[in-house]
Design a protein with these regions (language model features):
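A short, glycine/Asx- and small/polar-enriched loop/turn
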Residues: 34-36, 166-167
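Non-catalytic C-terminal accessory region of glycerolipid acyltransferases
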Residues: 96-210
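Generic preference for hydrophobic
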Residues: 27, 40, 63, 114, ...
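Catalytic core of membrane glycerolipid acyltransferases/transacylases, capturing the structured
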Residues: 1-12, 18-21, 35-92
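A generic structural signal for well-ordered alpha-helical segments
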Residues: 17-18, 79, 105, 139
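Short gly/ser/thr-rich secondary-structure transition/capping motifs
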Residues: 19-28, 95-96, 154-156
C-alpha cells in the first residue's frame, strides 16, 4: 500500500507539471498494457518522456536511469523508493548487476521502463539511435511482455527551445505486447532491432497527428 501511495504521489506531481506547462497529449493504445509486470521500451528525446509515461503507469514501475542521477541528493533517494535503478553505461559489470536487479523486480511483480537508446537522441525528430540489446534480457529471462512506447514531438516541449517551455501537442502510443517466446528465432535473436522497427514505424505513422 505504501508503494502505491508513493507511485500515486509522483504521478500526481508529474500530471500537475504537464498541466501547468500546457502540454496536450494524444494517448493511443493504453488498453494494450496487460495487467501483469511488463518491460516498457521507449524512444527518448526529452526529459519530459519520463513525466509523460510515468504519470500513466497502471502499476508499480521502476525506471532505469543513468548513473549520474544517483549523485543528486534527495532525488536519488526518492527514485530508489519507487524502484528506479541506476545504470552505469561505462562499466559492463555494474550494468549487468542493474539488469539482474531489474529481472528480480519483474519477478516480484514490478514493471520496468527503459529507454534503450542509452541517452537522449538529439537528432532529427523521427530518428532514433540504435537500441542496446542488453535491456531486452529483462524480458528474455523473465518471459514478461515487452510493451513498445512510441513518442512524437516531445523534444518540442523543452529541448528545442531551451530554457523555455512551449505548449505543444505530443503523441504517446502503447503498442501491442510482444512476448519473446512467441517470436521467430531470428527476431528473438535480434529482439532490440525488432522492437525498434515497431517504434520507428509507429512514430513515422503518428507524425501526421502533430
Amino acid at each position: 500500500a505504501r508503494d502505491y501511495s508513493c507511485l500515486r504521489i509522483v504521478q500526481w506531481g508529474f500530471k500537475a507539471i504537464l498541466k501547468v506547462t500546457g502540454v496536450h497529449t494524444t494517448v493511443i493504445g493504453f488498453e494494450n498494457i496487460p495487467d501483469e509486470p511488463v518491460l516498457f521500451i521507449g524512444n527518448h528525446r526529452s526529459f519530459f518522456d519520463i513525466l509523460l509515461t510515468y504519470s500513466r503507469c497502471p502499476r508499480l514501475t521502476g525506471y532505469v536511469a543513468k548513473k549520474e542521477m544517483e549523485k543528486i541528493p534527495l532525488l536519488s533517494t526518492w527514485m530508489r523508493f519507487v524502484y528506479c535503478l541506476f545504470l552505469d553505461r561505462e562499466n559492463p559489470k555494474e550494468g549487468l548487476k542493474t539488469i539482474l536487479q531489474a529481472i528480480d523486480y519483474v519477478k516480484q511483480g514490478i514493471s520496468i521502463c527503459i529507454f534503450p537508446e542509452g541517452t537522449r537522441n538529439k537528432g532529427e525528430e523521427l530518428s532514433m539511435l540504435p537500441f542496446k540489446e542488453g535491456a531486452f534480457k529483462i524480458a528474455a529471462k523473465t518471459g514478461c511482455a515487452i510493451v513498445p512506447i512510441s513518442m512524437n514531438n516531445t523534444a518540442a516541449i523543452f529541448e528545442n527551445q531551451f530554457p523555455r517551455i512551449k505548449k505543444v501537442n505530443v503523441v504517446v502510443e502503447y503498442g501491442t505486447p510482444i512476448y519473446p517466446k512467441d517470436l521467430a528465432p531470428e527476431d528473438k535473436k535480434h529482439i532490440g532491432a525488432y522492437v525498434q522497427n515497431i517504434i520507428q514505424e509507429t512514430i513515422n505513422k503518428n507524425a501526421e497527428l502533430i
